[in-house]
């Protein structure tokens, strides 16, 4: 059969023998070349396109021939010598794939392949990488490794031979023999009464000491209040003496003026005697009112009591001079 006139149709199959690879018609049950029977391993052929034929070739007016084929996927018309489509690369004769209906979803085939991984204590893992605990250690000779192992074994033996005194179980007997006087529940009532009396005495002592300290602390406060009351009384007496002296000076001035106006023609010794007689009871009143409480306050009051006398003398002198001038004019 010539290759030019060979046409693949749906259902044709390829011989499963790799050395043969002959394409047989769909109606054959055995290979036409090697005689091997058709099995399930034989792959079915599928035509990727169909020939256009003479009618379409005549309509193309010499552009295509009857052997040219049209692709089934993109419907492009390809030359007969092409084994693949010029547009979508679909093969002219393709192997028919099994239609299983599997789309590749999760657990679609129901036969999931589990990879069994064995965890070993080796130096390398399943991917051939060195484990972390072995990365920092330098590989030394076998003698050094043996020494390290011997040291580790000796350390374990020492740990086993440690002092086990803290794990002794015979300590309970020693505790039973200890002094149990503090746990005596049959103590007499006299001891309890003595303890109560001692507690009461200590409390009374603490209260008495507290009252003494409070009385001591209150004494300076009382002395302060007394000193404040004294200072206030002295200040009030000073203010009273000031007001009395001012009133006395005012009364003197008014009396002198009235006497000068009414008795211009009278003599001066009468005026002096009148002023001295009028001022003597007022001075006695001053002295009775302002009795100093301390020597410093007495000095201050003496100086203040002298000042109105000077004022009175000056006023009397002025009145005397006025009376003299009036007598001369007469």
Swiss-Prot record:
Q: Which ranges form a coiled coil?
A: none
**Residue span of region Required for nuclear targeting:** 151-324
Q: Which Pfam families match?
A: Zn_ribbon_RanBP
The chain residues annotated with the modification N6-acetyllysine are 18, 54, 92
Zinc finger intervals, RanBP2-type = 9-40, 65-94
- Recall the GO molecular function terms of this protein's record: lipopolysaccharide binding; RNA binding; zinc ion binding
A GO cellular-component term linked to this record: nucleus
**Localisation:** Nucleus
| Keyword RNA-binding annotated | yes
Region of interest: Disordered: 117-330
Question: What UniProt keywords apply to this chain's record, in alphabetical order?
Answer: Acetylation, Metal-binding, mRNA processing, mRNA splicing, Nucleus, Phosphoprotein, Repeat, RNA-binding, Zinc, Zinc-finger
Q: What is the first-listed, main subcellular location in coarse terms?
A: nucleus
Q: In which tissues is it expressed?
A: Expressed in kidney; more specifically in renal juxtaglomerular (JG) cells.
InterPro entries recorded for this chain? Znf_RanBP2, Znf_RanBP2_sf, ZRANB2
Q: Which SMART domains did the record assign? A: ZnF_RBZ
The answer to whether the entry has keyword Repeat is yes
- Residues modified as Phosphoserine: 9, 120, 153, 181, 188, 193
What is its quaternary makeup?
Interacts with the C-terminal half of SNRP70/U1-70K, the Arg/Ser-rich domain of AKAP17A as well as with U2AF1 and CLK1.
What is known about what this protein does? Answer: Splice factor required for alternative splicing of TRA2B/SFRS10 transcripts. Binds to ssRNA containing the consensus sequence 5'-AGGUAA-3'. May interfere with constitutive 5'-splice site selection.
Entry comment, domain topic: The RanBP2-type zinc fingers mediate binding to RNA.
Family recorded in the similarity comment: Belongs to the ZRANB2 family.
According to UniProt, the name of this protein is: Zinc finger Ran-binding domain-containing protein 2
Q: Which gene encodes it?
A: Zranb2
């Amino acid at each position: 059969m010539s290759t030019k006139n060979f046409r693949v149709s749906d259902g044709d199959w390829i011989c499963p023998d790799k050395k043969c690879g002959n394409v047989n018609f769909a109606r054959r049950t055995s290979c036409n070349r090697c005689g091997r029977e058709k099995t399930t391993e034989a792959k079915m052929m599928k035509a990727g396109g169909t020939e256009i034929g003479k009618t379409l070739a005549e309509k193309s007016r010499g552009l295509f021939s009857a052997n040219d084929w049209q692709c089934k996927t993109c419907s492009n018309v390809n030359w007969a010598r092409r084994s693949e489509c010029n547009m979508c690369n679909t093969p002219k004769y393709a192997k028919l794939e099994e239609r299983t209906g599997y789309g590749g979803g999760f657990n679609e085939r129901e036969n999931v392949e589990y990879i069994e991984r064995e965890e070993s204590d080796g130096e390398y893992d399943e991917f051939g990488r060195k484990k972390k605990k072995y990365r920092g250690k330098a590989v030394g000779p076998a003698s050094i490794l043996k020494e390290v192992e011997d040291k580790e074994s000796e350390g374990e033996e020492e740990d086993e031979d440690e002092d086990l005194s803290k794990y002794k179980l015979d300590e309970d007997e020693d505790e039973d023999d200890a002094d149990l006087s503090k746990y005596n529940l049959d103590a007499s009532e006299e001891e309890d009464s003595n303890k109560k009396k001692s507690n009461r005495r200590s409390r009374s002592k603490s209260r008495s000491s507290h009252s003494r300290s409070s009385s001591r602390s209150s004494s300076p406060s009382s002395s302060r209040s007394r000193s404040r009351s004294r200072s206030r009384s002295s200040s009030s007496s000073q203010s009273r003496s000031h007001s009395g002296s001012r009133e006395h000076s005012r009364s003197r001035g008014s009396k002198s003026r009235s006497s000068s106006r009414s008795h211009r023609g009278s003599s001066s010794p009468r005026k002096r005697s009148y002023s001295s007689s009028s001022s003597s009871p007022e001075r006695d009143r001053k002295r009775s009112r302002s009795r100093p409480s301390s020597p410093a306050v007495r000095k201050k009051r003496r100086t203040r009591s002298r000042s109105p006398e000077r004022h009175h003398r000056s006023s009397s002198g002025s009145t005397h001079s006025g009376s003299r001038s009036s007598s001369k004019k007469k």
